[in-house]
Design a protein with these regions (language model features):
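Gly/Ser-rich phosphate-binding catalytic loop and adjacent alpha/beta segment
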Residues: 2, 9, 14-148
């Protein structure tokens, strides 16, 4: 079960490894991918998402898991690597992508990590949308994304 407390007003954030895990990132990616398919699927059957990360030691693993989730939902991913959040926003707008995800906890302690989600034109996916995403994840069969 995903920790509901990581879903904040403007982003998803928590202690890396306990509150925010690779499995949680995979579930978040899959759920956000479903949202994008529902929102943009008639225009683009496979919405394209820019995914970047900060320099935290766990960000690469979280990025990989989140990309697994997005891909499992049917999204295409443009992996932009280690970048600050504004580069992700620029990429979404400049390349006219459907969405973006940045793995970052910004100014928070190094033990934390987080996820910022954006739609087209780098519009923040936040507020009640994040709570809807959480509820969607809570309906997923458990565990999602385990590999055999």
């Amino acid at each position: 079960m995903i920790d509901p407390h990581i879903f904040r007003a403007y982003d998803i954030r928590g202690k890396a490894g306990s509150q925010l895990t690779e499995d949680a990132c995979r579930q978040i990616g899959a759920a956000f991918g479903e949202v994008l398919i529902e929102k943009y699927g008639k225009e683009h059957p496979h919405p394209t998402v820019a995914v970047g990360r900060d320099a935290r030691t766990h960000s690469l693993d979280f990025e990989t898991a989140l990309i697994d989730g997005l891909s499992s939902a049917g999204c295409k991913v443009l992996r932009i690597g280690q970048t600050p959040s504004p580069v992700n926003y620029f990429t979404i707008c400049n390349a006219k992508l459907d969405a973006g995800v940045q793995i970052t906890a910004s100014h928070n302690p190094k033990e934390d990590n987080g996820i910022k989600l954006q739609l087209r034109n780098a519009e923040a996916y936040s507020g009640e949308d994040l709570q809807d995403l959480r509820r969607r994840i809570e309906t997923f069969p458990s565990p999602l994304g385990e590999r055999g």
